[in-house]
Structure formats: C-alpha cells, structure tokens
Amino acid sequence: YCGFLMPKICLIRPSIVVPAKNTTTMFTPPLGLAYVAGALRNSGFDVQFIDAVGESLDTRHPSDFDCYLYGLSPSQTVDRIRSDTEIIGVGFGFSFEWPTCRDLVEAIRDRFPSALLLGGGEHVTAVPEQTMKESALDIGILGEGEETAVEIAKGYASGRLEYKNIPGITYLDTHGEVIINERRARKRDIDEIIWPAWDLMPIENYLERGYGFGVNRGRSMPVMASRGCPYQCTFCSNPAMWTTRWIPRDPDLLLDEMQFYQKNYGAENFDFYDLTAIVKKSWIINFCNKIEEREMKFTWQLPSGTRTEAIDGEVARLLFKSGCRNMSYSPESGSHGVLKRIKKKIHPGSVINSIHSATLNGMNIKCNIIFGFPGETLKEIFESYLFIIKMALAGAFDISIWA
C-alpha cells in the first residue's frame, strides 16, 4: 500500500455491565479483538487498542437496572482515542452488552463525526438489522473478523471502499435500509491467523491478578486451539457466528504460541477459549503427547463447556498428565425431552460416565445446567434436579445453574 496514507485505527473493548448482586466478578482479556488487532498491524496499520475493562479493572460506575459498569466510563474511553484516528472498531460481544456498546458508539460519533465506525462480535452477527438500525455504526462485521477488518481498512486507505463488494458485513444504504452482504467464507487454515496483539493492551493487569476464563491458577493467558463447533444447539450463537465447521490448529504451532507466552509473559496457566476444544479424540491425544515431548510445564483448563464424548479414562489420564486440571461440561439438562428440543445430542448417562472417568484421574469437573427452556415442564425440571445430584455423586465439584 505504498503511496497511500495509512489511516490510524483504534479498536475498543467496552466496559462491562455486571449486576450489583453478583458475588464474584472476574474479567477476561479480549481474545477476539486482540486477534483483529494482530491482523491489522500485520497488514501495516497503526493500531491503538483501548481495553476499557483492563485499563481500570478495579473501577466501577453506577449503571441502569441495578447494575455496575466496570472499567472506564464512556467519556474516559472516548478521551483515550487519538485525535487523528480515522477508523474506530468496537467489540460488541454478547447481547447483554448491547446497551453499553450502543451508548459508547454514540459518544464516539459525537466526538469523531467523520470517523468510520465498525462493530463486530456475537450480537452484531446474531441481530444485524437491530444493530444497524439502533446504533451509529457505519459497518457491522459478521462472524470471523480478521480478514474483513483488514479488507475494510485497505479499501479505506486506497480511497476505494465499496461496501457492496465486501463479504461478511452489514450496513445501511442511502435509503436507510439494512443491507446484509453474503457471508465471508470461514478461514480453513487457522494456523495462518496472526497471533493476538497482546502487547497493545494492558495484559499485565489481568496476569498479576490471575484473571481468566477458568479457575485462578496464577498468571493465565487465553489461547484458542480450534474455531467453530459442529453441533447446533438451538440456544447457542455459534452457528451464526462461526458456522458448524470445527477447525483445529496444528498442535505444534499452538504449543509454539504457548511457549512464547511462557517466555515473554511468564504464563503459568492457559485458559482455552474454544467453543468445543475436544471433538476428535485423536487430536487431543496428539496435543497431550506433544506437551510431554517438549517437556513443557504449565497447567491448562477447558472452561467453556467441553463435550464429553471423547473423554474416557485414557484421555482423562493424558489430560491430567499434560497439566490439564479443570474442565467444564455443559449438558444443560437432565431431561431427554429438553435435550432433544434443544438439539444437544448427548445422553445424560454418557455425561455421568465421563465425569466419573475424569474425576478418577484427578480432573476437577464443573457442570452447567439451564432452567427455563421454552416449553420446559415441571417434570423435566425435576429430571434435571435428579441429574444434578447424579453429577455431584459422580464427582463434579461445581455445578452452575443458569436461568
């Protein structure tokens, strides 16, 4: 892009709304946005990264609906944006963050009326029409964001940014109608994706507190061993965000990244942010064996809701030997009727067997159960209560109830 004036870019992870009655609050580094920052910087752009949570982890502000806003206030966040910034991207995360993100975008638009405003994440992807109609965004990025963000930035830099020609975005046309372009194809070789640009954000603030997605086991870095999930649970945003293609990384290249974090950030533990890290038994066995071959020493966790099918006694022994200490299972319900309606594709009995095998081999197992699915009967709720007791007897040390 020699000859073009490269625009300055700012990526923002907004503050987070937390109910006032929450007894525990632990925040995680923004992995998705860090990947986008890495891709943009690798393409030659000058990227500023504002992590409104990480820059002020111990600060909270009163918010609506008996909640607190943790991190920088919207005005503090906007004040940190460089005055000559031309492209500003906001990570929207999930729908509970929508009001906060929308208000932040409005504040940015007031201060930077001519900037190109981008938004991406689960909420934008799931409800693009609402996002574009109710916010000041110019472009919403759908699904995997690295390639789309780079294409937008390059088009802007060249002066030839044509919204209609960019796959994987949504925007308003000249009549105020929402346009949703054809989705961008998933990247098949995810080992080509540039590592997250953690050096652009205050990662040390998380590390020194042991903050992460899983149990506090010291200085924890987030990593992703795969993208996507082959399952189609009806309540999950995965099919819209990532599609149902599960793509794993090369274990050696993943371990290269983890070794880099050990050397440069003093990482002691790794939290895997995968939607479904263990799909193929052969992959996880290979990964565990590679850790042993390299004689790497660390703990690692699978905190996001692991499938149980591939975890038997053999795999559980390898997991523990390689340093894995905590896993989360997400059976969601103990009722066959509910499981069928939500397309969970698991059997409660297999979950119990997997918990038993894992705990016998030293693993700490947490389980997630959801009450309140549409059409759920009292009988089905009772079945889930019985299932909770069975999981506890099988060895689960923590069971989270969601409603």
List each model region and its residues.
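Short, Lys/Arg-enriched N-terminal segments with co-localized hydrophobic residues
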Residues: Y1-L5
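A short helix->loop->beta-strand "cap" motif at the edges of active sites that frequently abuts
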Residues: P7, R111-L116, L137, F298, ...
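N-terminal [4Fe-4S]-dependent radical SAM core
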Residues: I9, S15-T24, I166, L172-P222
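Flexible glycine/acidic-rich beta-alpha junction loops that bind and position SAM and/or redox cofactors
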Residues: V18, S56-D58, P128, Y231, ...
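Short catalytic helix/loop segments, enriched in acidic residues and glycine
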Residues: F27-R41
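Glycine-rich beta-alpha loop elements in corrinoid/cobalamin-binding modules
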Residues: A39-D189
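Catalytic cores of alpha/beta
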Residues: P128-K133, V315, G375-K390
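Radical SAM [4Fe-4S] cluster-binding motif and immediate context
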Residues: D191, P196-K366, F371-F373
